[in-house]
Amino acid sequence: MLNIFTLANGRLFQEEIESLEELTRFQPIWVDLENPTVEEKRWIKQHYGLSIPEDAMDEDIEESARFYEEDNGDLHIRSDFLIDDNEQPRSVRVAFILNLTNSDLKSKGVLFSIHDEDVPVFRLLRMRARRAPGLIEDAKEVLLALFDGDAEYSADTLENIYDELEKVSKQVLAGDVTDTRAGEVLGAIARQEDLNGRIRRNVMDTRRAVSFMMRSKMLNAEQFEEARQILRDIESLDNHTAFLFGKINFLMDATVGFININQNKIIKIFSVASVALLPPTLIASVYGMNF
């Protein structure tokens, strides 16, 4: 799917592109390719002279190749975005190419984004940019807004983790936890631990991407300050993820402790039963041997 976003009266307007002819009629500041076809990549190559790398969304790409600037001034950034839905929480790799030097693109430049599936942060930005004039002024601000939205989405997800762990705490601290309930609790804790770890990794990734933009000296003073604010927000999120890891470990240890207590009770019952059911002749023999 190929969507382009043009800027008019301070708002972003979205158009779904289905042909090369359609693409040539617009001057977008953002071109978004979701699971692009070979033909859509060819349109980008023909119209913008930009080749989409074959490994654009490769998860195994070296860290040093995720953030770099080409000789022509194009910035390449590969960053992970969180998805927390009813399915398994996961991270989606998004490849960004920020083109600011092509004479055909004028001064606004164009941000190209390539990813395999829709990302909640992208949907949020599209909605806000349609309703709030002046939110976006150029391609660089689109990219900053996406990273800012990623930090906000991570913060919302952390709040959900707090809520879920609060429910787990009430079950664990209520006492008398059966093995069945303990298994359910451990499953819930493991899911929150995985989600918290993904958030911590994603915000670390976002920090690197924003820092790279700041070092590239492509941002004006206002955008630079916006980038610094994103980094401050991420630092705050780091503190929360660290606290949650401690809380998760405590709840997991407490739950495992209840499982051990239940097992000890069972062992004690079997021990008493085994003594009570010993054959009388064996008891008499033991009695005779000792006295």
Roles of regions detected by a PLM:
Residues 1-221, 229, 233-236, 240:
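Peripheral, non-transmembrane regulatory/ligand-interaction domains of membrane transport proteins
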Residues 209-224, 251-262:
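Long amphipathic alpha-helical coiled-coil segments
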Residues 235-291:
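Hydrophobic alpha-helical transmembrane segments and their immediately adjacent juxtamembrane loops
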